[in-house]
A protein has these predicted regions:
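A surface-exposed partner-binding patch
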Residues: 1-93, 176-179, 203, 207-213, ...
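Long, contiguous interaction/recruitment modules in multidomain scaffold/adaptor proteins
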Residues: 40-174
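Alpha-solenoid helical-repeat scaffolds
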Residues: 169-176, 189, 207
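Alpha-helix C-terminal capping/termination sites
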Residues: 187-191, 222-226
Length: 342
């Protein structure tokens, strides 16, 4: 049997990773949350796709708000091997069951949304297997077990006659990669207007993430619409920088925005000044909670920009979340600073 990435053997510890119980317990203890019902299916699907399972507390060097599930190695843009970590991102308390999107993290801190929920990720993975397989291969579907059966009837994609991104968007949900695929589909057909309309839908669906704005900025640039490319780049820099797509994308957005040579704090000052003095007067003095929230955002953006390291920021980040009235996130951050144990 295969060992896990962080050295767990084929004992009960490894079994607890494969059935999701270790990660579910960590969500409960470290985040005061309830793990998604599909967590076991999600973990088994990731393993079926070739990932190695990762202990939930193996968080050193990882985005402070991500609990790792599994990891794999891929080839980076420069030809070098690069680790990808799949995990659940902790979000602000919503008063009910925790909302934990599935993310893929590269470079330790750059998070891409790959599923708004565990259920949607599993469903898409099953359909992707059906779309790519020339044979009746159902490795991923089998790994998903009863959850997979409840989500997808085998052969439904094939008999639908729809393209993959169209099927996913209409039968499962919206995913950044599929939204981008739909835009490219329109462009390949010479339908620029439909492509831009789809961009608007993409932005309205995932506007709090940086990647959609990067994609749209790049598209406007290719179309020679430089002013709109600049505006989209500036929108990207107003989102969490860890969601922009990586160091190269961050640098490109800063350049397209016209803010070369500025660091994170300076760019935030520019963005604040663009609101105008009347906005500040209307808002009134900032509360301690608001100031703490803004500092937490600054720290995470500086982390994504490579200006600071996670090991040096976690304690202050946890303090900011506590002062901002987000004790659950503060606790999760501090748990990430604890030594990894078997």
């Amino acid at each position: 049997m295969k060992t896990t990435r962080d050295g767990a053997d084929d004992s009960a510890a490894a079994g607890n990773l494969r059935d999701g119980s270790a990660h579910a317990a960590y969500v409960r203890d470290a985040a005061n949350g309830k793990a998604p019902a599909e967590l076991e299916a999600l973990v088994r699907v990731l393993e079926a796709r070739g990932c190695e399972l990762v202990r939930p507390n193996a968080r050193r060097g990882l985005h402070p708000l991500v609990m790792p599930l599994a990891a794999t190695t891929t080839r980076g843009e420069g030809g070098e091997d690069e680790e990808e970590v799949y995990g659940l991102m902790m979000t602000e308390e919503s008063g009910g069951e925790s909302v934990m999107p599935v993310v893929r993290v590269r470079g330790g801190v750059h998070a891409a949304l790959v599923g708004k929920s565990a259920s949607e990720f599993v469903h898409r993975a099953i359909v992707e297997e059906e779309a790519r397989s020339d044979e009746e291969r159902t490795t991923v579907a089998a790994a998903a077990g009863a959850v997979g059966v409840s989500l997808h009837n085998h052969g439904a994609f094939t008999t639908s006659g729809k393209e993959f991104d169209v099927y996913v968007t209409t039968h499962i949900g919206k995913f950044p990669s599929s939204m981008e695929g739909l835009v490219k589909r329109h462009l390949d057909r010479g339908d620029e207007q439909s492509a831009l309309i789809t961009c608007d839908l993409y932005k309205s669906t995932f506007g709090e993430w940086g990647a959609p704005h990067v994609f749209i900025s790049d598209l406007y640039g290719k179309l020679g619409r430089d002013e709109e490319a600049r505006d989209a780049a500036r929108h990207a820099l107003q989102t969490p920088w860890s969601t922009i797509g990586g160091s190269e994308a961050i640098e490109r957005m800063i350049r397209v925005a016209g803010w070369q040579g500025k660091n994170v704090a300076e760019i935030k000052e520019v963005l604040e000044s663009r609101r105008g003095p009347s906005a500040a007067a209307f808002d009134g003095p900032k509360s301690e909670k608001q100031l703490a929230r803004e500092e937490s955002e600054l720290l995470l953006d500086q982390l994504a920009a490579g200006e600071i390291e996670a090991a040096t920021v976690n304690q202050r980040l946890a303090e900011c979340y506590m002062n901002a009235g987000k004790p659950t996130l503060a606790k999760f951050i501090m748990c990430g600073s604890m030594p990894t144990s078997a």
